[in-house]
């Protein structure tokens, strides 16, 4: 992938950009095999990759510069701002949005937050696009609600310029820390969720709900999990750390009992909406801590699917699964190091299948799916 920002030394986020994709995949596969070297693996499936540029459905832009000439991008470690609107990871559809947002920031008087001086209002702009219909969700992260009235007043102009904006919100993040969002979300549009669709499964994206940033590869990840589950004798499963329900909604059948657990209420609202659209009445989604939910249960289903954050599922949940011994565990991980550590805590299982998904091209990161079977 050619990147003028990288070539000019202005951005180094894509550390592997000079390596061809096949070399990147080989290096990631070698890393994964090294991490799982102590565990026999029956089948290594071929790695899955997608487009090498224009694949991201989300932009997280630090706003800096002045209200008349805002910059959207990032801050270097020394505090120097860098505009990343031309980043080739973003699809072409993002360019006109960035172009319209810069004059809008001036129109609405949204002074960019100055980290060094602790002054200003607009901290971040978060943009998400639906692959299914091109609709977009835009979130303004502000220090306070001081400029809210001005923003509302200027909004008709933005709608006129960008009719693809289906969901617009203001998030209030008052703390002087590098935290992306606060607890308060103020909706400025009638719609509160962005419609998405993977493999004919309706999904919804709301503010403060996690959603994969590489739709092309994520849709293949969900489809693969679905195919693996369909090959197993499963009538009841848990989907822990379920997010908006991507895995569970793909894997569920009309007669399967499924419980999805996720701590974020916004994500659970999305999952419930999707389940209702699909007419799946045997699905239950609850906003709870996944470990606390699981360890409080006196019995387990045949299959437990886990998709934890980078820290992994942790020893308490591993110990519980070892004791309760479900027939199958499907582990989806964005951090193979913690996954390998967790697998070590599950000695009663063998690894039947492993597949790498190149969710994050040009970096050392990747997603991995494993199927573990009770010995």
Curated annotation (Swiss-Prot):
The keyword Oxidoreductase does not apply. The active site is at 334 (nucleophile). GO terms for biological process: rRNA base methylation. Keywords: 4Fe-4S, Iron, Iron-sulfur, Metal-binding, Methyltransferase, rRNA processing, S-adenosyl-L-methionine, Transferase. Its EC number is 2.1.1.189. S-adenosyl-L-methionine binds at residues 212, 241, 262, 307. CDD domains: AdoMet_MTases. Pfam families: tRNA_U5-meth_tr. GO terms for molecular function: 4 iron, 4 sulfur cluster binding; iron ion binding; rRNA (uridine-C5-)-methyltransferase activity. Gene3D superfamilies: 2.40.50.1070, Vaccinia Virus protein VP39 (3.40.50.150). [4Fe-4S] cluster binds at residues 3, 11, 14, 87. It catalyses: uridine(747) in 23S rRNA + S-adenosyl-L-methionine = 5-methyluridine(747) in 23S rRNA + S-adenosyl-L-homocysteine + H(+). It comes from the Bacteria. Catalyzes the formation of 5-methyl-uridine at position 747 (m5U747) in 23S rRNA. Belongs to the class I-like SAM-binding methyltransferase superfamily. RNA M5U methyltransferase family. RlmC subfamily. PANTHER family: RNA M5U METHYLTRANSFERASE, TRNA (URACIL(54)-C(5))-METHYLTRANSFERASE. This is 23S rRNA (uracil(747)-C(5))-methyltransferase RlmC. It comes from Shigella dysenteriae serotype 1 (strain Sd197). The gene is rlmC.
């Amino acid at each position: 992938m050619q990147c003028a920002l990288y070539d000019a030394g202005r951005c180094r986020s894509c550390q592997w950009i000079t390596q061809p994709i096949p070399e990147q995949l080989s290096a990631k596969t070698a890393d994964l095999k090294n991490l799982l070297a102590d565990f026999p693996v029956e089948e290594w499936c071929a790695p899955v990759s997608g487009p090498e540029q224009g694949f991201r459905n989300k932009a997280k832009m630090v706003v800096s510069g002045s209200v008349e000439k805002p910059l959207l991008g990032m801050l270097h470690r020394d505090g120097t701002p860098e505009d990343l609107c031309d980043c080739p990871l973003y699809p072409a559809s993002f360019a006109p949005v960035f172009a319209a947002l810069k004059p809008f920031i001036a129109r609405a008087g949204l002074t960019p937050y100055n980290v060094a001086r602790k002054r200003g209002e607009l901290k971040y702009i978060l943009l998400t696009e639906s692959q299914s219909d091109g609709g977009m969700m835009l979130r303004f992260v502000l220090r306070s609600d001081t400029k809210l009235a001005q923003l509302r007043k200027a909004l008709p102009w933005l709608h006129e310029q960008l009719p693809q904006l289906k969901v617009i919100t203001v998030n209030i993040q008052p703390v002087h820390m590098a935290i992306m969002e606060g607890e308060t979300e103020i909706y400025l549009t009638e719609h509160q969720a962005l419609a998405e669709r993977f493999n004919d499964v309706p999904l919804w994206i709301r503010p403060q709900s996690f959603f994969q940033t590489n739709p092309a590869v994520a849709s293949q990840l969900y489809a693969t999990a679905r195919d693996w589950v369909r090959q197993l004798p499963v009538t009841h499963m848990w989907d822990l750390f379920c997010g908006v329900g991507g895995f569970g909604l793909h894997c569920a059948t009309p007669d399967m009992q499924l419980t999805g657990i996720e701590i974020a209420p916004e994500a659970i609202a999305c999952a419930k909406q999707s389940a209702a659209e699909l007419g799946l009445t045997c699905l239950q989604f609850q906003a709870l801590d996944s470990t606390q939910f699981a360890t409080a249960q006196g019995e387990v289903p045949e299959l437990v699917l886990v998709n934890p954050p980078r820290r992994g599922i942790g020893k308490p949940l591993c110990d519980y699964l070892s004791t309760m011994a479900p027939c199958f565990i499907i582990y989806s991980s964005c951090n193979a190091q913690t996954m390998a550590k967790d697998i070590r805590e599950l000695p009663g299982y063998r690894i039947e299948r492993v597949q790498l998904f190149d969710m994050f091209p040009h970096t050392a990161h990747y997603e991995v799916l494993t199927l573990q079977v009770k010995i």
